[in-house]
């Protein structure tokens, strides 16, 4: 399967799911239902598109991390079911958390994501590499550095906001609050437990589509076009 067909198949899966679920989300909105489960499910579509492309384009002898793929598809199916059921059989809000189906969906992300990651880590190196999922030491280090940079920029932005409003004391009081140091580890743990949501977009857009667009429109043009898409 050539590159053009792969891109078309990727778009077909990704935007096909988006279109169908978008119609259902619109129906739910006009019915006054909570539609928070739909955007969360939508974040999984791009990676699903890549997996379908890899399965369709692979050679007979080529091995892929099928256990990981199957688990991912199961997670996708369950999250889509939760989204659809949220407009058919609304469960109501869980105090302080969100709509019932959204809460169930969150558990699907966590349990399914952890299971998928374990199955991926157990795969042989060459099988993971065939799907672009073999994370090397320097890649993990780079990822941590980027996360630290994001945190630093967020704090700087927050500081500038307080400075412009003349509330520098209030900014300092944020770091004097013990609850901050309790919540930070929780947020980090939650980030890794729910990684599958972010993986869905990064694997689809960054890993698969961005290199194709950069090849055709240049490094900057490809990134800009990806942002538009």
Predicted stretch roles:
Residues 199-228:
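Membrane-interface helix/loop boundary segments of multi-pass membrane proteins
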């Amino acid at each position: 399967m050539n590159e053009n067909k792969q891109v078309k198949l990727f778009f077909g899966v990704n935007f096909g799911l988006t279109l169908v679920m978008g119609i259902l989300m619109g129906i739910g909105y006009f019915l006054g239902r909570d539609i928070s489960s739909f955007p969360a499910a939508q974040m999984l579509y791009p990676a699903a598109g890549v997996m379908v492309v890899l399965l369709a384009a692979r050679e007979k002898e080529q091995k892929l991390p099928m256990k990981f793929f199957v688990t991912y598809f199961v997670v996708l199916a369950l999250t889509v079911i939760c989204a659809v059921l949220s407009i058919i059989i609304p469960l109501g809000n869980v105090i302080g958390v969100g709509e019932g189906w959204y809460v169930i969906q969150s558990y699907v992300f966590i349990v399914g994501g952890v299971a998928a990651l374990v199955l991926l880590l157990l795969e042989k190196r060459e099988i993971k590499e065939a799907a672009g999922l073999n994370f090397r030491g320097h890649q993990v280090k780079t990822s941590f550095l980027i996360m630290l940079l994001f945190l630093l920029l967020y704090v700087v932005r927050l500081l500038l906001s307080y400075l412009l409003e003349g509330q520098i004391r209030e900014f300092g009081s944020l770091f004097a609050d013990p609850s901050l140091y309790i919540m930070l580890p929780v947020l980090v743990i939650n980030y890794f437990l729910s990684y599958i949501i972010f993986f869905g977009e990064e694997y689809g857009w960054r890993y698969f589509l961005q290199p194709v667009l950069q090849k055709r429109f240049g490094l900057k043009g490809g990134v800009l076009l990806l942002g538009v898409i």
